[in-house]
Amino acid sequence: MFKFQKEQEIANIAGIKVGGQPGELPTVLAGTIFYNRHEIVEDAAKGLFDRDAAEKLVNLQESGSDTTGNPHMVHIFGTTAESITRYIDFIAEVSDSPFLIDSPEGPVRAHAAGYVSEIGLADRAVYNSINMSINTSEMKALEQSDIDSSIILGFNAKDSSLQGRMEMLETGAGLLEEGLLSIADRCGIVNKLIDPSITPMGNGAGIALRMTIAAKAKWGHPTGSGIHNAPSAWNWLNRQKEKDPVLYKICDIGSTCLQQAAAGDFILYGPIEYAEYVFPMAAMSDIMIAEAVADLDIEPVERHPINFLV
């Protein structure tokens, strides 16, 4: 293992700390709820869902966090302004944790930013994400909101190399007038969480691991990803899924360890149902990493799996 020469930022999001040197803080884990075709969702457009089942899933994640010491956030996914509003209200009611607001639609993300500001929850919200598709209206909505935490996505549709992704953050890579980090500054983002972006296996998925290290070395911001998207988009693995669902689940969940070993600070681990497996696995990695850097003058915080489970 290693220690970064660059001072590493530690972001504080509603009491949850993320970032720092490898082995210093436990990995922050975020499970996704209300995702596409989630069985608990009854009407994705209106945001109708089985409330009892949803609360059990949130509690499952919180239980994993209580057991291992790994902090957690709830990754909310919505496709319409109506649905994401209902989802935010529900998560705020049943949990005190920070939450990510995510949608494939920019106007929906912008609406969510305004809504959490209106109801006084902006300090708990993480915008997901500032990316190369951001336009003027979305920037304006984010700038006018009270949100100060956001994921900055390093996806570059023209150049998925390490250089292309880094340039997207720093300069806009010739596709934007300025880099995404600069845009984040203009939008009032203090807590910048860098996500290198996960492309399919065979199309540069592993570059995200290298970029995690490169980004932390260059800027010092907390960095992580939704690395499970690599195995979940793996054609070979998907062909095995019907024959052996356990094999699929092992690869999907196991990818968590790869991101942690590459100095990841946070992980969007996919379906929140996987919490009962992800938290012990992430805790195991955190313990081993903390032990690996013990002689590098890196001391784990009190609330760390090494102090909970060893």
Curated annotation (Swiss-Prot):
Its EC number is 2.1.1.-. It comes from the Archaea. GO terms for biological process: methylation; one-carbon metabolic process. Keywords: Methyltransferase, Transferase. Coiled coil: none annotated. One of its GO terms (molecular function) is methyltransferase activity. Signal peptide: none annotated. It is an enzyme of class 2 (transferase). May be part of a complex composed of 3 subunits; MtxA, MtxH and MtxX. Belongs to the MtrH family. This is Putative methyltransferase mtx subunit H. The gene is mtxH.
